[in-house]
Design a protein with these regions (language model features):
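Extracellular/periplasmic solute-recognition and catalytic clefts
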Residues: 1-49, 60, 72, 183-187
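Solvent-exposed loop/turn segments at secondary-structure junctions
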Residues: 9, 15-18, 38-40, 49-51, ...
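Ligand/substrate-recognition segments at binding pockets and active sites
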Residues: 1, 117-190
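Loop/turn elements at helix/coil->beta-strand transitions in domains of secreted/extracellular proteins
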Residues: 6-8, 27-30, 53-58, 66-68, ...
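A generic secondary-structure signal for well-formed alpha-helical elements
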Residues: 9-14, 64-69, 74, 78, ...
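Append "and occasionally in soluble cytosolic enzymes with long acidic Gly/Pro-rich linkers
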Residues: 33, 52-153
Length: 194
């Protein structure tokens, strides 16, 4: 619609992907303005699920998530990696925290020490239970699907089977509100919204 002249402007999250933004940045026909970040993209872990109730599993996933690669490879650097939920510019949020470093070897070691041993099919197991985690994403979001597929591949290297499920937006939101997920994408807008 923008390219056909049917609309004058695109604004907001999930309205346009990083590929299109980069295309428009190089175009003489369009002007692109990017604001400072006002939200934080996140993946919420449901700690009431059997597997994710284990702190060591959650920490291992943190170490197995290469936020810089997601920033560079999916967002072309347009979205920077976040190490905290709120920006340091939010009152009382400018605190010293040591972020989890990307380290697949450490992630595997943490899982080994927590009793999650590599089983058949390169999926870890503990007490006969495979390390299967479901990630729910909004099927309308190309970005969320790309991140989900990247994480699925990355987690596979440490023996975690990440099953990704795209759902239309209303179903996605209903399942998120009901807690029917292991992992789910969300956005934190900061004050005054959160």
């Amino acid at each position: 619609a923008l390219e056909k002249g049917e609309i004058d402007m695109i604004f907001g999250k999930n309205m346009i992907d990083a590929d299109a933004i980069n295309q428009y940045l190089d175009s003489d026909k369009f002007t692109v303005e990017l604001s400072d970040p006002t939200s934080t993209r996140q993946i919420v872990l449901n700690t009431s699920s059997d597997i994710l109730s284990e702190k060591d599993v959650r920490i291992a996933l943190q170490h197995a998530t290469n936020k810089q690669n997601i920033s560079d490879g999916i967002f072309y650097g347009l979205e920077k990696p976040a190490d905290t939920l709120f920006a340091s510019t939010v009152p009382y949020c400018d605190i010293e925290l040591e972020p989890y470093v990307y380290d697949l070897e450490l992630a595997g070691q943490i899982l080994d020490e927590a009793g999650w041993k590599m089983g058949s099919g390169n999926v870890r197991e503990k007490d006969g239970q495979p390390l299967n985690i479901d990630l729910l994403y909004n099927s309308d979001s190309v970005t969320e699907k790309s991140i989900a597929e990247y994480l699925q591949s990355e987690y596979q290297t440490i023996g975690v089977a990440l099953n990704i499920h795209g759902e239309e937006e209303q179903s996605y939101r209903d399942n998120m509100k009901a807690g029917n997920f292991d992992m789910v994408f969300n956005i934190c807008w900061g004050t005054p919204y959160d």
